[in-house]
């Protein structure tokens, strides 16, 4: 609708550019991320979980006990309706509202390089790029696995900012950091991993 949404520590606001009016949506605090769900609803990420806002009535619905107390840094809703949630310590959570299901990726159950996800950018060619505490990670949607680009693979040292990034018209990815913007070209090649079966010829526990 061409509105501008603004969050913060104390309240949520919507600026209507056609009427120059501002509407307050009291009820949540410490808003960290705002994403449109559909024409009537907005996803609101906060320092204590996820909410679904009815923009007409102003009512909030808490989204799932699995996210209770989770600090959310970034939100991205894909074209298929899946909501990708970047958290500050709990990895990446994929939420499917139709059946209220959650899929959680973190360092112990995937190749994700860090559990602190700062920014999630829109999907391009089946890949979703994210900035993390330890570098940039690329999630392959179909295969459901991560490839990482860290200082060990040549990434310049950077401390990324939460919810700071954009997808350019040329499909390159831009992430904001404390040292400026870092642009990643669309055709960047991430290090690939090779896995093989290990065979032990001896095993000793002391």
What feature does the model see in each segment?
Residues 1-206:
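Carboxylate-rich, polar loop motifs that coordinate divalent cations or form catalytic acidic clusters
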């Amino acid at each position: 609708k061409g509105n501008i949404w603004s969050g913060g520590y104390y309240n949520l606001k919507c600026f209507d550019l056609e009427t120059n009016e501002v509407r307050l949506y009291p009820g949540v605090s410490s808003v960290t991320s705002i994403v449109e769900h559909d024409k009537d609803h907005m996803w609101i990420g906060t320092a204590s979980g996820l909410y679904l806002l009815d923009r007409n009535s102003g009512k909030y619905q808490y989204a799932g006990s699995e996210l209770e107390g989770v600090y959310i840094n970034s939100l991205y809703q894909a074209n298929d309706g899946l909501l990708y949630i970047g958290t500050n310590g709990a990895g990446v959570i994929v939420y499917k509202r139709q059946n209220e299901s959650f899929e959680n990726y973190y360092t112990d159950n995937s190749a994700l390089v860090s559990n602190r996800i700062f920014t999630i950018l829109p999907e391009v060619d089946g890949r979703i790029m994210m900035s993390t505490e330890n570098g940039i990670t690329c999630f392959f949607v179909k295969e459901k696995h991560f490839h990482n680009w860290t200082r060990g693979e040549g990434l310049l040292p950077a401390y990324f900012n939460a919810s700071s990034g954009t997808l350019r018209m040329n499909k390159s990815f831009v992430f904001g950091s404390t040292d400026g913007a870092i642009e990643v070209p669309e055709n960047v090649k991430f290090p690939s991993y090779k896995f093989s079966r290990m065979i032990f010829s001896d095993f000793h526990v002391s």
